[in-house]
């Protein structure tokens, strides 16, 4: 079967107990193209925003992976598991649980630039082997702490009864942040253990649940309805400044050549990421870079 010539961004509201790769397979089948990727995996137990990249949009993956993401999570106190979430085996338990005030007192120390030790049950690799493959063999290795940024961490609910004590948190964080590790570390800081009981991604970059469609709804649609859901590739970069080029300079940019700012009348700071437009619309991402003859904008990814 020949791939359809179709491109765009699809926001799926991923349900529980399916993998991100399952969603890639579904989109390949429904959109009739093998060119499908995503902009950041969700574990099977997690739900919410999964940014699917169809056709030429798959080229945007590396850039979208860097975007800030927002999650809603439930932290259950009193137990620790080998996976740091509720799907794992309990490896420690505690008869004590924190009060709401005690939890609120430690949260500020988990905001901003922090370090996390990645969990063994993760897709990170050591000597070509994924850590979760080693973990399933009962092997644990030392992992270096990695810097991540927690931009926002807010307590939205706290409840305690005879069965459990749980807290609902909203977290906005950088690439590479493990929410289950955050839950685990908060529990350890409070001296009572903690594990992630639920996780829902509500925002990834510019995309929210308002843009999302469920897999079941997607299956019910006809081809035209599904195609109409696809967002333009440029929507992923709506927060970047746009530079519109006349045909002469657009031809240079299409060839990957730098264009000096003094020649097109722009004064963007070095390091600025930009969107390139020609008479047909968005066609590339670029960056402002220094050159001997002055500052220039350089195409770095053509779409």
State each model region's role.
Residues 1-211, 285-286:
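RNA pseudouridine synthases
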């Amino acid at each position: 079967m020949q791939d359809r010539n179709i491109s765009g961004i699809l926001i799926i509201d991923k349900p529980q107990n399916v993998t991100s790769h399952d969603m890639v397979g579904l989109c390949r089948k429904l959109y009739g193209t093998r060119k499908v990727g995503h902009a950041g995996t969700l574990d099977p137990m997690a739900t919410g925003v999964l940014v699917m990249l169809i056709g030429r949009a798959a080229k945007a993956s590396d850039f979208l992976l860097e975007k800030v993401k927002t999650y809603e999570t439930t932290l259950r106190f009193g137990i620790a598991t080998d996976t740091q979430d509720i799907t794992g085996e309990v490896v420690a338990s505690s008869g004590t649980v924190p009060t709401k005030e005690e939890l609120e007192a430690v949260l500020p120390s988990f905001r901003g630039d922090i370090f996390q030790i990645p969990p063994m049950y993760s897709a990170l690799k050591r000597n070509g082997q994924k850590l979760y493959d080693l973990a399933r063999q009962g092997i644990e290795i030392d992992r270096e702490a990695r810097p991540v940024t927690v931009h926002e961490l807010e307590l939205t609910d706290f409840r305690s009864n005879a069965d459990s004590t749980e807290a609902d948190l909203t977290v906005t964080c950088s690439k590479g942040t493990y929410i289950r590790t955050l839950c685990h570390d908060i529990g350890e800081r409070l001296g009572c253990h903690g594990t992630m009981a639920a996780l829902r991604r509500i925002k990834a970059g510019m995309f929210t649940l308002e843009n999302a469609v469920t897999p079941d709804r997607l299956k019910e649609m006809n081809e035209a309805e599904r195609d109409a859901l696809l967002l333009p590739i440029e929507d992923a970069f709506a927060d970047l400044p746009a530079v519109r080029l006349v045909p002469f300079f657009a031809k240079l940019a299409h060839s990957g050549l730098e264009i000096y700012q003094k020649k097109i009348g722009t004064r963007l700071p070095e390091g600025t990421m930009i969107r390139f437009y020609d008479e047909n619309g968005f066609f590339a991402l670029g960056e402002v870079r220094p050159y001997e003859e002055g500052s220039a904008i350089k195409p770095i990814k053509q779409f």
